UniProtKB/Swiss-Prot annotation:
It comes from Saccharomyces cerevisiae (strain ATCC 204508 / S288c) (Baker's yeast). Residues 210-212 are annotated as: G5. The lineage of its organism: Eukaryota, Fungi, Dikarya, Ascomycota, Saccharomycotina. Residues 96-100 are annotated as: G2. Belongs to the TRAFAC class translation factor GTPase superfamily. Classic translation factor GTPase family. EF-Tu/EF-1A subfamily. It comes from the Eukaryota. The precursor is processed in two steps involving mitochondrial intermediate peptidase (MIP) and mitochondrial processing peptidase (MPP). This is Elongation factor Tu, mitochondrial. InterPro entries: EF-Tu_GTP-bd, EF-Tu_GTPase, EFTu-like_2, EFTU_2, G_TR_CS, P-loop_NTPase, Small_GTP-bd, T_Tr_GTP-bd_dom.
Length: 437
């Protein structure tokens, strides 16, 4: 992998959120109660960490997530959720794949986890970007029967692009493999692949097991015991992140829904700062003028919060706001701290063909999609005025500075990173260096 890419893609604050176990339905049921006293207070006695399962379709990500909840449920650290409870959408069950990201809550002896189960199907890879963008670390699942596959590589690339630095490997379906040399080959390939994408492949924990055996209570050495080894590795290898608590509150909007008689709830992952009930907020993005509102309730995993803080996946009940006034990609922010913009100067790295990017160059007026926080917006790219030759081509593997015009106002800040996608694949990544308008 180009040495330039890791330099451009250093660790940043994680910038997006997903649904908490189809978050809208969970918080909807909670907020629809006549009073919020229904919800227990959220326990903050353990460090809170956001992790997730990534990897190729059908390699067992959702089965592993279910196996983790079953194993920890026996120890009082989770509520058991089977495969169907995690893949709740009818289309997901019918096709046997995860389409949107779903969140599960559990605890080990050391930590409280919010676990996002990311889709592996190529048609829904952009939803995986949202899931990956909120992880403090990740478990990449690879089937022993297949080894690394195309989405194994793409998920590692996406995880690297959004700032995930620590990866634990779970080699799944080992109950179907009789040849130990095949398992050794899969481990060797995964270590090489991690190194190729800028991770520490030499030292990353690799756990061999079978999520299905853990679910069905068979072969405990590769079932339940392997799941506990995996969780121990996650506890030890993925560091507890330092949260950005001292800056003004900001939470990107992931999902929106209405609660009859209560108001509108926005769900998302708090990017920075703190929020308390009764505080005033601005909703920024899409509109030229921010919307003003007041927070009337905060909950996480069906538990009431007095306040939300950076790293929390929360539902926020807003006063006087209709659902049709809000869109995914907006942000909730402390009044006066964030503005929406339509033109920026950005430093871009265009992925090479070998990195899964474009096979050919592009010129001025290129129109890809920009993924930034939870926003997905079309941009028109042009060379800065200082560039003499506006007819030149930007080639795969290039670093280049471009002016980007966004088709609608989007909350942006200098220093933010974003992904560029076109035709169902990631083609580049960028860093905002200047706000123009």
């Amino acid at each position: 992998m180009s040495a330039l890419l890791p330099r451009l893609l250093t660790r940043t604050a994680f910038k997006a959120s997903g649904k908490l176990l189809r978050l809208s339905s969970v918080i909807s049921r909670t907020f629809s109660q006549t009073t919020t006293s229904y919800a227990a207070a959220f326990d903050r006695s353990k460090p809170h960490v956001n992790i997730g399962t990534i990897g190729h379709v059908d390699h067992g990500k959702t089965t592993l997530t279910a196996a983790i909840t079953k194993t920890l449920a026996a120890k009082g650290g989770a509520n058991f959720l089977d495969y169907a409870a995690i893949d709740k959408a009818p289309e997901e069950r019918a096709r046997g794949i995860t389409i949107s990201t779903a969140h599960v809550e559990y605890e080990t002896a050391k930590r409280h986890y919010s676990h996002v189960d990311c889709p592996g199907h190529a048609d829904y890879i952009k939803n995986m970007i949202t899931g990956a963008a909120q992880m403090d670390g990740a478990i990449i699942v690879v089937a022993a029967t297949d080894g690394q596959m195309p989405q194994t590589r793409e998920h590692l690339l996406l995880a690297r692009q959004v700032g995930v630095q620590h990866i634990v490997v779970f080699v799944n379906k080992v109950d179907t493999i009789d040849d130990p040399e095949m398992l050794e080959l899969v481990e060797m390939e995964m270590r090489e692949l991690l190194n190729e994408y800028g991770f520490d492949g030499d030292n990353a924990p690799i756990i061999m097991g079978s999520a299905l055996c853990a679910l069905e209570g068979r072969q405990p050495e590769i079932g339940e015991q392997a799941i506990m080894k995996l969780l121990d590795a996650v506890d030890e290898y993925i560091p507890t992140p330092e949260r950005d608590l001292n800056k003004p509150f900001l939470m990107p909007v992931e999902d929106i829904f209405s609660i009859s008689g209560r108001g509108t709830v926005v769900t998302g992952r708090v990017e920075r700062g703190n929020l308390k009930k009764g505080e005033e907020l601005e909703i920024v993005g899409h509109n030229s003028t921010p919307l003003k509102t007041t927070v009337t309730g905060i909950e996480m995993f069906r538990k009431e919060l007095d306040s939300a803080m950076a790293g929390d996946n929360a539902g926020v009940l807003l006063r006087g706001i209709r659902r049709d006034q809000l869109k995914r990609g907006m942000v909730l922010a402390k009044p006066g701290t964030v503005k929406a913009h339509t033109k920026i100067l950005a430093s871009l790295y265009i992925l090479s063909k070998e990195e899964g990017g474009r096979h050919s160059g592009f010129g001025e007026n290129y129109r890809p999609q920009m993924f930034i926080r939870t926003a997905d917006v079309t941009v028109v790219m042009r060379f800065p005025k200082e560039v003499e030759d506006h007819s030149m081509q930007v080639m795969p593997g290039d670093n280049v500075e471009m002016e980007c015009d966004l088709i609608h106002p989007t909350p942006l800040e200098v220093g933010q990173r974003f992904n560029i996608r076109e035709g169902g694949r990631t083609v580049g990544t960028g860093l905002i260096t200047r706000i123009i308008e």
